[in-house]
């Protein structure tokens, strides 16, 4: 492995990876990015061949001194240790969400901590914007990315994790262009007083990047970290759709004054719905600022930004396109069952065992069923429970995607019309640390209704 604290990239072989292996497992390759005390390498898991990212953070151990006599270097080293602890704790707590980068492993030497992370090979959103020559995303593309960001932030908040440094540099893209929220080193925890610095749920620590920081932080007030994250998300949304910062000035104090006054102007190409959402997020008063859970109900996010069969359902959900295609292929396989196979099953019969055991997934056959009634019932119950519901119907199939605003539950229900007016109904739970009432109803077949 590279020498502890070595600032140079490891010598790479012809395939781009180092001959030396980090702790017998990870072959380090080129540097993907670096900060004042850390570097991120592209790496390969020697055991599995999987490509990963390794974040190397120098600890720079300092001699022990009385806290009042610590040098600036020692204080910086102590801060880095706290940030590493926070990042690891936060990533472990929010693991499993499709739009949060996954922590795979943690390694350490006397001088360096290595975080092995899911590789997002598409680079950062900032790099993507720069590659457009200072351009911006159109609204459908921005809506897709922003929905993924909002889902990740809502998920983190529901688990008591507040990021506090949301900016394009910390938003990565995978090979499909889906977003991953990363770098939780400045995060705060709702249930840990030592992180919030208070016992009333209000943060006291002032952190984050100046252009993305909420006014209440600049004014050195105690603040609600969840509302500060919403402000940062609003700045990100502006940058995605405008291509530049809403508050920018060569003079830092002048920029701070603009932020505190919320003085900004959307470009002329922004729709009224987009202007409305940005305005709600960049509200200088935290008490009236839109909440993360309310964002999903805003008209701008409710628009269908895609012409594909499931459009926004695919764009904002946990399913990537390959997963959706696999799912549809499995349904096509199920449709190949002949009429004799199908008609022998009673109404509401669970086909999971016939097609193959799949975790968190149930399939039913309903002879003589009505697809609209099934979808109506799923949609009604989902909305009654406060879930975000999106529905799409075609001649021979229909589907409903439901998602909790907390990010703790995501599911699909899809109905396919088979020969002889038989319905094939499949429900799949993608994320499920919360189990809404309607999911229990689905499992026992209570939503399978006839005309």
Swiss-Prot record:
Induction: By drought and salt stresses and abscisic acid (ABA). Residues 330-356 form the NAF domain. ATP binds at residues 32-40, 55. GO terms for molecular function: ATP binding; protein serine kinase activity; protein serine/threonine kinase activity. Residues 361-389 are annotated as: PPI. The active site is at residue 165. Residues 26-301 form the Protein kinase domain. This is CBL-interacting protein kinase 22. The lineage of its organism: Eukaryota, Viridiplantae, Streptophyta, Embryophyta, Tracheophyta.
């Amino acid at each position: 492995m590279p020498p502890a604290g070595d600032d140079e990239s490891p010598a790479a072989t012809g395939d781009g990876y180092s001959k030396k292996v980090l702790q017998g497992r990870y072959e380090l390759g080129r540097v993907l990015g670096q900060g004042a005390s850390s570097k991120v390498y592209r790496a390969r898991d020697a055991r599995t061949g999987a490509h990963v990212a390794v974040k190397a953070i120098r600890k720079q151990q300092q001699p022990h001194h009385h806290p009042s006599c610590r040098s600036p270097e020692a204080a910086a080293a102590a801060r880095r240790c706290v940030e590493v602890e926070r990042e690891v704790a936060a990533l472990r707590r929010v693991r499993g969400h499709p739009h949060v980068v996954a922590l795979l492993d943690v390694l350490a030497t006397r001088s360096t901590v290595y975080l092995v992370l899911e590789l997002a090979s598409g680079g950062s959103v900032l790099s993507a914007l720069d590659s457009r020559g200072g351009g911006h995303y159109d609204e459908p593309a921005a809506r897709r990315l922003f929905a993924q960001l909002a889902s990740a932030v809502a998920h983190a908040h529901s688990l008591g994790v507040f990021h506090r440094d949301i900016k394009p540099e910390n938003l990565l893209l995978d090979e499909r262009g889906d977003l991953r929220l990363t770098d939780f080193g400045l995060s705060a925890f709702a249930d840990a007083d030592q992180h919030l610095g208070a016992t009333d749920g209000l943060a006291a620590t002032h952190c984050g990047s100046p252009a993305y920081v909420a006014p209440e932080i600049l004014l050195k007030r105690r603040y609600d970290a969840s509302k500060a994250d919403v402000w940062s998300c609003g700045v990100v949304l502006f940058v995605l759709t405008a291509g530049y910062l809403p508050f920018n000035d060569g003079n830092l104090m002048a920029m701070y004054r603009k932020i505190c006054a919320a003085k900004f102007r959307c470009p002329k190409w922004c729709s009224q719905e987009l202007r409305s959402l940005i305005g709600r997020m960049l509200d200088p008063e935290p008490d009236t600022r839109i909440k993360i859970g309310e964002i999903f109900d805003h008209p701008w996010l409710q628009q269908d930004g895609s012409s594909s069969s499931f459009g926004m359902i695919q764009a904002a959900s946990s399913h990537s396109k390959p997963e959706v295609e696999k799912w549809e292929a499995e349904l096509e396989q199920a449709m190949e069952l002949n009429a004799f196979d199908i008609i022998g099953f009673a109404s509401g019969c669970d086909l999971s065992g016939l097609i193959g055991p799949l975790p968190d997934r149930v399939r039913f056959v309903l002879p003589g069923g009505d697809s609209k009634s099934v979808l109506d019932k799923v949609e009604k119950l989902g909305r009654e429970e406060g879930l975000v519901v999106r529905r799409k119907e075609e001649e021979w199939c229909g589907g409903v995607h439901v998602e909790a605003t907390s990010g703790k539950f995501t599911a699909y229900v899809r109905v396919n019309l088979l020969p002889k007016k038989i319905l094939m109904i499949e429900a799949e739970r993608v994320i499920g640390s919360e189990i809404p009432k309607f999911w229990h109803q689905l499992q026992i077949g209570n939503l399978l209704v006839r005309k």
